[in-house]
Amino acid sequence: MTDMRALGYLIHLGSNMWRDTPLAGAAPDATDHVLMRCCADYNRCDDAVWRRLTDHAAARGFNMLVIDLGEGVQYPSRPELAVKGSWTPDKLRKELARLRSIGLEPIPKLNFSATHDTWLGEYHRMVSTPEYYRVCEDVLRDAYELFDHPRLFHIGYDEETAWHQQWHRYSVVRSGELWWHDFLKIESFVEKLGTRPWIWSDKIWHHEAEFLKRMPKTVLQSNWYYDAEFTEEELEKAKASEDRKAYVKAYRTLEKAGYDQLPAASNWGCDINFEKTVRYCRKWIAPERLKGFMTAPWWLTEKKKEAKCLAAIDLAAAAMEKERLGLL
């Protein structure tokens, strides 16, 4: 798929991407939300649920699957990152072939935000060191080869703030020149591999001038916003914070600056978000820079949240059908 606009689904193969608190040590009354964010020493991806979700996405007209890899795969150059049940390279390759056969373009995702890198194991505590840079390049190269040279590679880089790490046992937040040094180092390496870097765009929310000055236009942008209010009137009526207004504004700012975008929506906060994201972004983003849409339900590939993930697929498919019929 090259020219066709993407309709993507974000699916989790790995899960150790939030808190560094071990799952085994979680409080007895911990909610599903907390448990999902703890790190586990085994792969929590349910193969049967994975199959049903991917088949359903293909049946509903999706053409892209963004795979959050994390610790979910055994990296040939870094076997120490695997956990019990991590997919072998052979298993992953066979599944990627199946996905392509049903019309889903598989795209690798590895998140290098210091808030979301628990999957890096001991290297999670070595951020910005020579060994950290080596392991990042090793897993990027491995994933690039395992995916047979994909045209896009999502490298994350969202939510690297102290607030987002308040529940971590070990916290590290890069800022200023160090954040840009590390980001541009990874971004450049991905481009040298022969693929296009893709990131979450929330860095722009509170560092707009710096972002517009330093973010390469070659990087595909996924701004994300999961609430129901988009217009100025809706935001004012909801008494939205200045932060929330900035989240929505970012779509327009990125467009004005000439960045390619693939907006991310979700049923995490409400069921109407995907439809309203499509409506808003079609209005404000030029067709040649609007590369598609992605839904990200943010639940793991487990039976207990399968219905929520299926609903995310259905809501996105319904919104795209409305768009096709001119009802948005």
What are these regions (language model features)?
Residues 124, 197-240, 269-285, 302:
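Substrate-binding cleft/loops of secretory-pathway carbohydrate-active enzymes
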Residues 46, 50-51, 88-92, 132-137, ...:
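Well-ordered, non-membrane alpha-helical segments in soluble/globular domains
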Residues 7-220, 225:
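Aromatic-lined carbohydrate-binding surfaces of glycoside hydrolases
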Residues 1-4, 146-147, 213-216, 254, ...:
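Extracellular/periplasmic catalytic domains that process cell-envelope and extracellular macromolecules
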Residues 116, 150, 154, 163-167, ...:
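Charged, low-complexity C-terminal accessory regions
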Residues 257-328:
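Substrate-binding cleft of secreted/luminal carbohydrate-active enzymes
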Residues 90-96, 135-140, 223-233, 284-301, ...:
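Short, basic, helix/turn surface patches
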Residues 57, 99, 190, 254, ...:
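Hydrophobic alpha-helix position signal
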